[in-house]
Amino acid sequence: MSDDNQTKLEAADIQALLAVLPHRYPFLLIDRIVDIDGDVSATGIKNVTINEPHFTGHFPENPIMPGVLIVEAMAQTAGAISLLQRKTGRPGVVYFMTIDSAKFRRPVVPGDRLLLYVKKIKQRANISKYECVAEVDGVKVAEAEVAAMISVADENL
């Protein structure tokens, strides 16, 4: 059957994410992915809650999601769409390689719904670079470019 006749994956729920990502609580930072366009672009969703462990110390009287976790959520979204679209049966792992041009524009707080827009801008062999934007209520809160490498279990890095 050709790829044109196959059903395209348009969304991934938490079970699909758990099947491809190695991350688990408290470091799985995306709840769902929607608007998937192959391994080219997608929108990750992170529902930010006060129950997350980083809010205990960041900051007790004014809880703010650490910027590094926003970037990690972007990277997990990019990695997940890469792994969800793999044609091989061999298990893959995504290794986060670089962060470029990261900017944080406003705080993300408990109760926010973080939308993580990722778009592939470059690929060479098993390394992909993504342009990422995070928004809350239609307002850009962060942006970055991230690069990652896919490795399979029987390959050497």
From Swiss-Prot:
Location(s), subcellular: Cytoplasm
Domain of life: Bacteria
Primary subcellular site in the record, as a coarse category: cytoplasm
Keywords, alphabetical: Cytoplasm, Lipid A biosynthesis, Lipid biosynthesis, Lipid metabolism, Lyase
Reactions the enzyme catalyzes: a (3R)-hydroxyacyl-[ACP] = a (2E)-enoyl-[ACP] + H2O
HAMAP family: FabZ
PANTHER family linked to this entry: 3-HYDROXYACYL-[ACYL-CARRIER-PROTEIN] DEHYDRATASE
Protein name: 3-hydroxyacyl-[acyl-carrier-protein] dehydratase FabZ
